């Protein structure tokens, strides 16, 4: 079970949002690269970056801190990024800069042809981010709820050739209210590619619950507020996950 620390970037700083609300921000650091170095030292095997300004603007907006993070971690661990990725040129620039995986969310839902092209152009490097509330997909930084069913879209995107799916329950994200294991497992059982859980992970009980369903295809989890506020010790959590799923 791969536990992935999240670094959410807004105005060059490392922040966390509650339920995706850009007006409900907690700033954790003015130095995202130092945060990245810390997670590397704690034993992280991958980092998850989100360009929050980019998600709203539809194009990269935190290039300086992203570049600093990539310099800080070097070739030690892969880095994945999402937020505002709407065209193949942006993907290519990120991959050329040293990003290992690019996460496409809103653009995949609004323009499936773009996702199809991206999976063809950059095989093995495209992850789809599906954000949902009550089984329905949300887009545009979670500001718009659609009628798309998460299971139907996941299957369609798997057929396109995406590498994995990050499933975020936006009703729980940033709330430390517990991960939605049932919904995550339902999705993982519906596809053959890896699913990473995100949203609401509050403590070790959630990690253990996810480890129990790894065989269903839940291969990892994105950790945010819990590891920044001390509800979860990342190093201890990854060690426990390794113990349960080795």
From Swiss-Prot:
Q: Which GO terms describe its cellular component?
A: cytoplasm
UniProt enzyme class: isomerase
Catalytic residues, chain numbering = 8 (proton acceptor), 131 (proton donor)
Q: Which SUPFAM superfamilies match?
A: Ribulose-phoshate binding barrel
Sorted UniProt keywords: Amino-acid biosynthesis, Cytoplasm, Histidine biosynthesis, Isomerase
Q: In which pathway does it act?
A: Amino-acid biosynthesis; L-histidine biosynthesis; L-histidine from 5-phospho-alpha-D-ribose 1-diphosphate: step 4/9
Q: Name one Pfam family in it.
A: His_biosynth
Any coiled-coil ranges, and where?
none
Q: Which reaction does it catalyse?
A: 1-(5-phospho-beta-D-ribosyl)-5-[(5-phospho-beta-D-ribosylamino)methylideneamino]imidazole-4-carboxamide = 5-[(5-phospho-1-deoxy-D-ribulos-1-ylimino)methylamino]-1-(5-phospho-beta-D-ribosyl)imidazole-4-carboxamide
Keyword Lyase among record annotations: no
- GO BP, sorted A to Z: L-histidine biosynthetic process; L-tryptophan biosynthetic process
Q: What is its EC number?
A: 5.3.1.16
InterPro entries membership: Aldolase_TIM, His_biosynth, HisA_bact_arch, Isoase_HisA-like, Isoase_HisA-like_bact, RibuloseP-bd_barrel
User: Where does it localize?
Assistant: Cytoplasm
Q: Does the keyword Aminoacyl-tRNA synthetase apply?
A: no
- One Gene Ontology molecular-function label: 1-(5-phosphoribosyl)-5-[(5-phosphoribosylamino)methylideneamino]imidazole-4-carboxamide isomerase activity
User: Which superkingdom does the taxonomy of this entry point to?
Assistant: Bacteria
Family as reported in the entry's similarity comment = Belongs to the HisA/HisF family.
- Recorded protein name is 1-(5-phosphoribosyl)-5-[(5-phosphoribosylamino)methylideneamino] imidazole-4-carboxamide isomerase
- Gene that specifies this protein: hisA
């Amino acid at each position: 079970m791969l536990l992935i620390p999240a670094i959410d970037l807004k105005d060059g700083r490392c922040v966390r949002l509650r339920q995706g609300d850009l007006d409900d921000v907690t700033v954790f650091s003015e130095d995202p690269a130092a945060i990245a170095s810390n997670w590397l030292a704690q034993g992280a095997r991958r980092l998850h970056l989100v360009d929050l300004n980019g998600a709203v603007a539809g194009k990269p907006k935190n290039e300086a801190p992203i570049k600093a993070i990539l310099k800080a971690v070097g070739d030690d661990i892969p880095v994945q990024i999402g937020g505002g990725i709407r065209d193949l040129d942006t993907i290519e620039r990120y991959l050329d800069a040293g990003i290992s995986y690019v996460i496409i969310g809103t653009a995949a839902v609004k323009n499936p042809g773009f996702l199809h092209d991206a999976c063809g152009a950059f095989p093995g490097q495209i992850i789809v981010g599906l954000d949902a509330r009550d089984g329905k997909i949300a887009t545009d930084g979670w500001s718009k709820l659609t009628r798309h069913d998460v299971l139907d879209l996941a299957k369609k995107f798997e057929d396109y050739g995406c590498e994995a799916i990050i499933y975020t329950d936006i009703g729980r994200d940033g709330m430390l209210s517990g991960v939605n294991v049932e919904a995550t497992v339902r999705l993982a059982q519906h596809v053959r590619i890896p699913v990473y859980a995100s949203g609401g992970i509050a403590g070790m009980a959630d990690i253990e619950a996810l480890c129990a369903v790894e065989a269903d295809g839940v291969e990892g989890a994105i950790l945010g507020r819990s590891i920044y506020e001390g509800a979860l010790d990342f190093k201890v959590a990854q060690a426990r996950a390794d113990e349960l799923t080795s």
